[in-house]
Regions:
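PLP-dependent amino-acid enzyme catalytic core
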Residues: 1-123
Length: 125
C-alpha cells in the first residue's frame, strides 16, 4: 500500500508530542542544502520518529515489541516502548559497540547479544 501525504501528516501529528522539534538549518557552504538536526533527538537519531510512530500505531492487544538492530533503531524502539509502558527486546550482533548496548539497556529494553553478524542476530526474533 503506498504511503500518501495524508499518511505522513497523520504520523507527524501523532508523534509530535513524543519527539523533539529539531531545527532546520542552512549549510553555509552549500546554499541549496538544508540540514535537519535530528541528532538532537533524545536518542541521537531520526529513527525515533519511525519507532515512535510504530509503537503508537500498534494494536491495543500488543504486549511487547522486538527488533534486530545495529544500535540506533534499537535505541529508538527502546525509548518509544518505555514511553508507552510496554516491554522491548532488541537483538544485536556481537559487532555492536558496548556503548550502544548500554544505551539500549538503560532505556529498559531486554538486550540479546548473539550472532557474529546482524543477519545472524535476526534468528533470535
Amino acid at each position: 500500500m503506498p504511503v500518501t501525504l495524508a499518511d505522513i501528516r497523520a504520523a507527524s501529528a501523532r508523534i509530535a508530542p513524543h519527539v523533539a522539534r529539531t531545527p532546520l538549518v542552512a549549510d553555509p557552504r552549500l546554499p541549496q542544502v538544508w540540514l535537519k538536526c535530528e541528532h538532537r533527538q533524545p536518542t541521537g537519531a531520526f529513527k525515533l520518529r519511525g519507532a515512535t510512530n510504530a509503537v503508537l500505531t500498534l494494536p491495543r492487544r500488543a504486549r511487547a515489541v522486538v527488533t534486530a538492530s545495529t544500535g540506533n533503531h534499537g535505541r529508538a524502539l527502546a525509548h518509544a516502548a518505555q514511553a508507552a509502558g510496554i516491554p522491548a527486546t532488541v537483538c544485536l550482533s556481537h559487532l555492536v559497540p558496548d556503548n550502544k548496548v548500554r544505551a539500549i539497556r538503560e532505556l529498559g529494553a531486554k538486550v540479546r547479544v548473539t550472532g557474529a553478524s546482524q543477519d545472524l542476530s535476526l534468528i533470535h526474533i
